[in-house]
From Swiss-Prot:
CDD domains, per the entry: NAD_bind_m-THF_DH_Cyclohyd (cd01080)
Function: Catalyzes the oxidation of 5,10-methylenetetrahydrofolate to 5,10-methenyltetrahydrofolate and then the hydrolysis of 5,10-methenyltetrahydrofolate to 10-formyltetrahydrofolate.
Name of protein: Bifunctional protein FolD
Pfam name, any one: THF_DHG_CYH
InterPro entries, per the entry: Aminoacid_DH-like_N_sf (IPR046346), NAD(P)-bd_dom_sf (IPR036291), THF_DH/CycHdrlase (IPR000672), THF_DH/CycHdrlase_cat_dom (IPR020630), THF_DH/CycHdrlase_CS (IPR020867), THF_DH/CycHdrlase_NAD-bd_dom (IPR020631)
PROSITE patterns: THF_DHG_CYH_1 (PS00766)
Catalytic activity: (6R)-5,10-methylene-5,6,7,8-tetrahydrofolate + NADP(+) = (6R)-5,10-methenyltetrahydrofolate + NADPH; (6R)-5,10-methenyltetrahydrofolate + H2O = (6R)-10-formyltetrahydrofolate + H(+)
UniProt cross-references to SUPFAM superfamilies, sorted A to Z: Aminoacid dehydrogenase-like, N-terminal domain, NAD(P)-binding Rossmann-fold domains
Lineage: Bacteria, Bacillati, Bacillota, Bacilli, Lactobacillales
UniProt KW keywords: Amino-acid biosynthesis, Histidine biosynthesis, Hydrolase, Methionine biosynthesis, Multifunctional enzyme, NADP, One-carbon metabolism, Oxidoreductase, Purine biosynthesis
Organism, scientific name: Lactobacillus gasseri (strain ATCC 33323 / DSM 20243 / BCRC 14619 / CIP 102991 / JCM 1131 / KCTC 3163 / NCIMB 11718 / NCTC 13722 / AM63)
HAMAP family recorded: THF_DHG_CYH
One example GO MF annotation: methenyltetrahydrofolate cyclohydrolase activity
A biological process term (GO) from this entry: purine nucleotide biosynthetic process
Binding of NADP(+), residues: 164-166, 189
Length: 282
């Protein structure tokens, strides 16, 4: 391994830049405000929300938290989102996932106004990504791009395999990497002979949530690996890539934890500021 793609350093740089940017906005009478909605009491969500709130406070974003009970109907939640869409004091809206089964996440994505879409999941913003016309990007995708740029990884002409086709990571990531002239293949649960694809890949990005999915025999020498997966095995947090065996072959690889993860919340805060600027014609 020539390069460890750790995310803490670029995340800290984003945080410091956001502090300065938000201070300047506040000096002009603009107070970036992000509304974070939680439905139910998912333990993992509680932890992630705490991290979001702490960083929002640190950089100077006004975070408005709304909590709904687990039995909240979809209609009630969507009604509240529509109210927030019309509130000029709210610049960004996000709903913490997962939500209870009676609520369809797609309905949430379709209801949040694109100009207040902090997560970057609205159909309009995702469509604009495919046209190369949007800087509203899902936070995990922005985190991956930040790592790519921070460490000077050139994507043009690179055979790139994305493992995972979610609307949150895989599909929008393919869109932005195509804009960077990468040759992109998306693999998923029905893909046959995954190893044949990854062995020819210059860059492998995995977002599946399956430990030891990508092993040493599936990776060519000098490949770049970006691991978005999160798994817990025997009390240890790990990604999709079998780090210990793959790292010696890789030109660059992200650790888990400490790679993409530290950047995701910082990327969300950056998006809230982008939305605020757009709403104020900045």
């Amino acid at each position: 391994m020539k390069k460890l793609l750790e995310g803490k350093t670029p995340a800290n740089e984003i945080t410091e830049n956001l502090k300065k940017e938000i201070k300047n906005l506040k000096n002009d009478g603009i107070n970036p405000t992000l509304c974070v909605i939680e439905v139910g009491d998912d333990p993992a969500s509680k932890i992630y929300l705490r991290v979001k709130r702490n960083l929002a406070k640190k950089v100077g974003i006004n975070e408005v938290g709304l909590h709904f009970p687990a039995d909240t109907s979809q209609a009630e939640l969507l009604g509240k989102i529509k109210e927030l869409n019309q509130d000029p004091n709210i610049n960004g809206i996000m709903v913490q996932l997962p939500v209870p089964p009676q609520i369809d996440p797609r309905a949430i994505f379709e209801t949040i106004a694109p100009e207040k879409d902090a997560d970057g999941f609205s159909p309009l913003n995702l469509g604009r990504l495919w046209e190369g016309q949007s800087d509203i990007i899902p936070a995990t995708v922005r985190s991956i791009l930040t790592l790519i740029d921070y460490y000077g990884i050139k994507m043009a002409g690179k055979n790139t395999v994305i493992i995972g086709r979610s609307v949150i990571v895989g599909k929008p990531l393919a869109a932005v990497l195509l804009e960077r002239d990468a040759t992109v293949t998306i693999a998923h649960s029905k893909t046959k002979n995954l190893a044949d694809l990854t062995r020819n890949a210059d860059v492998i990005i995995s977002d599946v949530g399956k430990a030891h999915l990508v092993t040493e025999d599936m990776v060519k020498d000098g490949a770049v690996l970006i691991d978005v997966g999160m798994n817990r095995e025997n009390g240890k947090l790990m990604g999709d890539v079998d780090f210990d065996t793959v790292a010696p072959k890789a030109n660059a690889i992200t650790p888990v934890p400490g790679g993409v993860g530290p950047l995701t919340v910082a990327s969300l805060m950056k998006q809230a500021v982008i939305l605020t600027r757009k709403q104020h014609g900045r």
